[in-house]
Amino acid sequence: MASTKDRENFVYIAKLAEQAERYEEMVDSMKNVANLDVELTIEERNLLSVGYKNVIGARRASWRILSSIEQKEESKGNDVNAKRIKEYRHKVETELSNICIDVMRVIDEHLIPSAAAGESTVFYYKMKGDYYRYLAEFKTGNEKKEAGDQSMKAYESATTAAEAELPPTHPIRLGLALNFSVFYYEILNSPERACHLAKQAFDEAISELDTLNEESYKDSTLIMQLLRDNLTLWTSDIPEDGEDSQKANGTAKFGGGDDAE
């Protein structure tokens, strides 16, 4: 059984790794804390999230760049180069899959079972929804549908907990609404539902803005700005008749909207 001193050491190493931009080691240290099966502090929770976000973020950026180059090569008829890029893209996709599987295991086996506070429960289900969404960004066919279904399920669980436990101005509840709306837009190709969710979250937060404490004011208002930016971007995609637009190939748009940590 690890001692309090061990836990403090893991957290300190994670902070060092973050400053040194060694995010894989940051994740490893915070996984050691998660494996203790204790309720993580807000600081520990954020360290774990930031570590994984950077590890996955680098690969997501690589995948988008490779996909864009691949499309250009295909449009030029450069089949040999397109094949090379496809093979390289699959390597990145394997890394993405492995990271997401690792996140799910930590969340399901350690974080959710150890979560006592409502805020923690929302945070972890939101995180689960995010990483299934990242899988759905590049998976195809049945695997894409399965990842999308699991992402939806996790976001819905997070939303139920958030509405019961957190005020509309809470940054975690706002971040959840932001990311869930991005899921509707990018994965389900539904700008109408994305806008509805984002607008509802924004309006509810605005109506209670005077209750916002100074501590979370900056975080909450930043996410509200992102919600508004996405609404502006997405509104133009809603057809005149109000029906959801379904993109023929079912692939996510690159840069379809901002999401939260």
UniProtKB/Swiss-Prot annotation:
Please list where the region (Disordered) is annotated.
Answer: 237-261
Q: Please give the coiled-coil regions recorded for this protein.
A: none
Q: Which InterPro entries match?
A: 14-3-3, 14-3-3_CS, 14-3-3_dom_sf, 14-3-3_domain
SMART domains the record matches: 14_3_3
Q: Which GO terms describe its biological process?
A: post-embryonic root development
Single Gene Ontology MF annotation: calcium ion binding
Q: Name one Pfam family in it.
A: 14-3-3
Family designation: Belongs to the 14-3-3 family.
Supply the PANTHER family for this chain: 14-3-3 PROTEIN
Protein name per the record: 14-3-3-like protein B
Source species: Vicia faba
